[in-house]
């Protein structure tokens, strides 16, 4: 049994996808990009991003949990760089973690990003690239920037597969 729903067609790095449209609140519909498990798309897009970032001063790739993790991983592998994931929940093993609050466009709720204490040492004094799947309001990037600043890292580039909305 198949369901019928509206989609928005996209093509990125030679790969075509139909993104399902969702109403996130009255009057606002967005096309949802979910790259989790889509290895063909992730590989193509990450290779294209890695090529665009190749001449940038980058020591570490940084992303926020969760949907952009495969992208950050694949970009980091292609560029032979380490990567760091900012978590959305605190775990005791994270030690003296840094935190920053952002607002999620998909849930409309505040969310907190955490930088594990062990990753602070990895990024301190380094040039970092912030990588996300989609930039909508920019609030996640703002939270990521704040954490990088507090950790002593320098954001040299920001990259995403898509931007959407007026503030992206």
Question: Model-flagged regions — what are they?
Answer:
Residues 1-58:
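Active-site-facing substrate-recognition patch
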Residues 2-10, 142-168:
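PRPP-dependent phosphoribosyltransferase catalytic core
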Residues 58-65:
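Short glycine-rich phosphate-binding loop at a beta-alpha junction
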Residues 59, 126, 156:
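Conserved acidic residues
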Residues 69, 138, 142:
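Glycine-rich SAM-binding Motif I of class I
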Residues 70-79, 145:
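Short Gly/Thr/Asp-enriched flexible loops that form oxyanion-binding sites at enzyme active sites
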Residues 81-128:
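Short, glycine/charge-rich flexible loops or terminal/linker lids adjacent to PRPP-binding catalytic cores
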Residues 134:
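C-terminal binding/interaction regions
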